[in-house]
Amino acid sequence: MSNEEAGQYVLKCGNVSMTIDAAKGGKILSYKYDDQEVISQLKWPESFGSTFWTSPQKEWYWPPVPEYDKKPYAVEEKEGVLTMTSEVNDKLKYRIRKAFKTDEQNQAIVVTYSIINVSDETRKVAPWEITRVQNEGGLIFFEAPADSIWPAGLMNFKDANGISCYEPDEANENRKVNADGKGWLAYLNREKGLLLVKQFEDLVAGQPAPDEAEIQVYVNRGKTYIELESQGAYTTLQPGEELNWTVRWYLQPSTPASSDALVQQVKNMLKTDK
């Protein structure tokens, strides 16, 4: 773990490195295998890196809450864990905490997000991670029947033995779909031969926040960027209580010969036969 620039911290796990900017919203700015970047490096707002919001979105709508998305986070490094803590938003009355650590044995970087209810009221909220990647020559896939994705017809997901696969395309409108997956979401960058996999809690029906979902894919208009989104369970928090939600990040080289081989690589990374 190193502090290469003011406010920016780098975690390294084998060939993989993750850069987090505590000075600007605790965002994950970079995720690399050796020197090959896998997440978006665009410069205009809300187009780069990986961030964290509270769900449902209807509670704050837009733009993202500055205390969670853009303002500085306090930093603590202790026993191999890098912890970043946000300010409290006056309207929502939550504090966000992000804890980063490496899992050398499984070659993963583990991110645990916490939402703390600092209000004097009982609240309901869900965690929500948003990771942006380039819209060029990639493949997005997860475990769910293609005909279960909603709204139907917005993106051309194809079914491959129960795996929904989407080759990003271009449209003159913003598009977003929802899915009930199986606790993982993957992105293949064909140009760089890299496979990004994020693993999280597998939700069941009724657990996501209203009008939200375990897995969401947002494609920005044109050929710009895509958001890989995952959400945890909609949770009741009493005053002073917190929820904790963990996402495990994996990144490996990949040159699969088929979709079956690609899915098998994911299962090997996650060490699951499911």
Where are these regions (language model features)?
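Terminal connector regions
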Residues: 251-274
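Acidic-aromatic substrate-binding/catalytic surfaces of carbohydrate-active enzymes
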Residues: 8-70
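Residue-level detector of beta-strand face positions
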Residues: 8-10, 30-32, 83-85, 114, ...
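A contiguous, surface-exposed recognition patch within enzymatic or periplasmic domains that forms
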Residues: 9, 16-18, 23-29, 37, ...
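Sequence termini and other peripheral, non-core segments
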Residues: 4-6, 14, 274
